[in-house]
């Protein structure tokens, strides 16, 4: 299994993909005011047998590390210390925008969009990672 993580200031989205099917799906949204996302993701990785965790990197449209990069770098360091799974970083540009548009197109209510948007953004990022890895083969 592979976990995908979309890091946000208030919520952290998590998605999962099977190494064989290579199809990402949203799993959960972690409210950072109620749980330490590093602990929860490490537990998910252990429980699901994930050997890889892909964390979205906040890049600007120009491809440079954005303002949230320092927080993400610290998060990745803490996650690497908390789990035996490999941790990689991957471009998360526009994933939240794509997630929001997809949810709107599906007719999701504002409350539903708010509740699942971050997990769907993690799904979009993880699927992008998987597709890019497939193209490199």
Language model: regions and residue ranges:
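Phosphate- and other anionic-substrate recognition elements at nucleic-acid/protein interfaces
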Residues: 1-5, 9-137
């Amino acid at each position: 299994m592979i976990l995908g993580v979309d890091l946000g200031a208030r919520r952290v989205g998590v998605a999962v993909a099977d190494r064989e099917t290579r199809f990402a799906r949203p799993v959960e949204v972690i409210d950072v005011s109620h749980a330490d996302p590093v602990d929860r993701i490490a537990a998910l990785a252990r429980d699901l047998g994930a050997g890889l965790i892909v964390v979205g990197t906040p890049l600007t449209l120009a491809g440079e590390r954005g303002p949230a990069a320092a927080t993400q770098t610290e998060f990745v360091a803490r996650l690497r210390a908390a789990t035996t799974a490999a941790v990689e970083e991957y471009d998360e540009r526009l994933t939240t925008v794509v997630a929001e548009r997809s949810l709107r197109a599906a007719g999701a209510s504002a409350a539903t969009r708010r509740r699942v948007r971050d997990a769907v953004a993690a799904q979009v990022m993880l699927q992008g990672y998987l597709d890019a890895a497939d193209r490199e083969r």
